[in-house]
Swiss-Prot record:
It comes from Trieres chinensis. It is found in: Plastid, Chloroplast. Binds 5S rRNA, forms part of the central protuberance of the 50S subunit. This is Large ribosomal subunit protein uL18c. The keyword Ribonucleoprotein applies. The lineage of its organism: Eukaryota, Sar, Stramenopiles, Ochrophyta, Bacillariophyta. The keyword Plastid applies. One of its GO terms (cellular component) is ribonucleoprotein complex. It holds the Pfam family Ribosomal_L18p. The gene is rpl18. One of its GO terms (molecular function) is 5S rRNA binding. HAMAP family: Ribosomal_uL18_B. Belongs to the universal ribosomal protein uL18 family.
Length: 135
């Protein structure tokens, strides 16, 4: 029996039968339908793992990554103790903004993925705003 994505998300809320990874995948796909990056306003995509955080600015119409940054980058890794903190996420946002302004990208669409806008995701967004990106 096949269900639509919306029905599966509702089932998750009602009886908690979906596995967490499947739920994240469905949530990501449902958000992806709403958020698209264009050459004028590319998409800032965020991935958060337990140890690190990764961010990239993507032009979806041409399927190209324009700018990327993570806590594994050498210059950021030297300035932080670990990639799990909000301070590290804020540095990632500021560096991403700096790199994107060099490529004349000022307006973006923020794609938080399946993650809540809280903690490290919010810190990254605040750092990008402080760096000069508008979203």
């Amino acid at each position: 029996m096949k269900f639509s994505k919306r029905v599966l998300l509702k089932l998750k809320n009602k009886n908690k039968k979906l596995k967490p990874n499947k739920y994240k995948q469905l949530k990501r796909e449902s958000l992806r339908g709403l958020i698209k990056g264009t050459p004028e306003r590319p998409r800032l995509s965020v991935f958060r793992s337990n140890e690190n955080i990764y961010a990239q600015i993507i032009d979806d119409t041409n399927s190209k990554t324009l700018v990327s940054c993570s806590t594994l980058d050498r210059d950021i890794k030297l300035n932080i103790q670990n990639g799990r903190t909000c301070d590290a996420s804020k540095l990632i946002g500021q560096k991403l903004a700096k790199l994107s302004l060099k490529k004349n990208i000022t307006k973006i669409v923020f794609d938080r993925g399946p993650y809540l806008y809280h903690g490290r995701i919010k810190a990254l967004a605040d750092g990008a705003r402080e760096g000069g990106l508008q979203f």
